[in-house]
């Protein structure tokens, strides 16, 4: 069983992008495939997964940054954003995510 730990920022934004039903499908998929996302370079193991929304393909969908702690049965959902609004994650945000994940894994 996987427990999802949602950051305050993720919780604030998720319903701007996904319906409850879409979010449920996303969680089921991620629980079954926790290593599916690409590891973001310089993030300390944070992964980015592309997820399509209803009526859009992956390129018009959202990106979710997450950290999988499979040995602890946890997936940390950190950030969700539209592909159209952000080309890449700024370095200072990646650094903050890396520091947070280092703290979590200790």
Residue ranges: model-predicted function:
Residues 1-21:
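Arg/Lys-rich, positively charged N-terminal/basic patches that mediate binding to nucleic acids
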Residues 12, 23-29, 37-40, 99:
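N-terminal targeting/export leaders
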Residues 20-23, 59, 94:
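Amphipathic alpha-helical transducer elements in NTP-driven molecular machines
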Residues 28-58:
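A short, surface-exposed loop/turn module that caps and links secondary-structure elements
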Residues 54-56, 67-70:
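Short polar/acidic secondary-structure junctions
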Residues 60-64:
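Short, surface-exposed coil-to-beta transition loops
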Residues 68-106:
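Enriched for short, Lys/Arg-rich terminal
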């Amino acid at each position: 069983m996987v427990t999802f730990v949602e950051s305050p920022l993720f919780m604030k934004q998720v319903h701007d992008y996904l319906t409850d039903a879409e979010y449920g499908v996303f969680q089921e998929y991620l629980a079954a495939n926790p290593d599916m996302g690409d590891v973001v370079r310089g993030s300390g193991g944070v992964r980015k997964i592309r997820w399509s929304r209803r009526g859009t393909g992956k390129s018009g969908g959202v990106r979710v940054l997450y950290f999988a702690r499979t040995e602890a049965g946890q997936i940390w959902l950190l950030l969700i954003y539209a592909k159209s609004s952000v080309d890449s994650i700024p370095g200072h945000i990646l650094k903050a995510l890396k520091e947070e994940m280092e703290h979590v894994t200790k």
